[in-house]
UniProtKB/Swiss-Prot annotation:
Enzyme Commission code: 3.6.1.-
Keyword match Hydrolase: yes
Function (record text): Accelerates the degradation of transcripts by removing pyrophosphate from the 5'-end of triphosphorylated RNA, leading to a more labile monophosphorylated state that can stimulate subsequent ribonuclease cleavage.
Protein family membership: Belongs to the Nudix hydrolase family. RppH subfamily.
Provenance organism: Haemophilus influenzae (strain PittEE)
PROSITE patterns from the UniProt entry: NUDIX, NUDIX_BOX
Entry cofactors: a divalent metal cation
Protein name per Swiss-Prot or TrEMBL: RNA pyrophosphohydrolase
Nudix hydrolase domain ranges (all copies): 6-149
Gene from which this protein is expressed: rppH
Length: 196
């Protein structure tokens, strides 16, 4: 399903643990890492697509996670010209994505990248919250920056009990990195949110 502007509706999934780390997945046979994502089928809601992709790509069921937040807007990225399929009609020029923030509430042993005959990923690891913004393929980087900034406002400001150990470290890291310093989540904001 491709919209009138040439974008394919898609969901992206950020899974975090109680340490404030996020699940980073390795694409099969490549040295390329990303968050799980996938297309939305006809007659399927974004949330339904997210749970389907969660099982197909990561092997998790709805009971294994807690839905914390959904991005407010669709975020778009264009595919590089080398990846465009000019012979397909309609032609897809990129993805428009609704992003979901999940917290793993079951044992990480339930994570299984091999649940389908054609798995997307062949490995995974936990990484620091901001790591994916710098490491993802360049044409997805702007979307990742926007997603993680929006999700940080939920994890590190509104929910003080979720990641108490990692809150200040994550905020200081984000604030110190000049390349991604367009944020208000400073140490002062952190203490203000705690009433100090």
């Amino acid at each position: 399903m491709i919209d009138f502007d040439g974008y394919r509706p898609n969901v992206g999934i950020v899974i975090c643990n109680r340490k404030g780390q996020v699940l980073w997945a390795k694409r099969c046979g490549q040295n390329s890492w990303q968050f799980p994502q996938g297309g939305i089928n006809d007659n399927e809601s974004a949330e339904q697509a997210m749970y389907r992709e969660l099982h197909e790509e990561v092997g998790l069921q709805p009971k294994d996670v807690r839905l914390l937040y959904v991005s407010k807007h669709w975020l778009r990225y264009k595919l590089p010209k080398r990846l465009l399929r000019y012979d397909s009609k309609p032609m897809c020029i990129g993805q428009k994505q609704r992003w979901f923030l999940l917290q793993l509430v079951s044992d990480e042993k339930n994570i299984n990248m091999q649940t389908t005959k054609s798995p997307e990923f062949d490995g995974w690891r936990w990484v620091s919250f901001w790591y994916p913004v710098r490491q993802v393929v360049s044409f997805k980087r702007d979307v990742y920056r926007k997603v993680m900034k929006e999700f940080a406002s939920i994890l590190f400001t509104d929910n003080p009990l979720i990641f108490s150990a990692s809150r200040e470290a994550s905020l200081q890291h984000y604030s110190a990195n000049k390349k991604y310093s367009q944020t208000k989540y400073t140490k002062r904001h952190f203490y203000k949110s705690r009433g100090q």
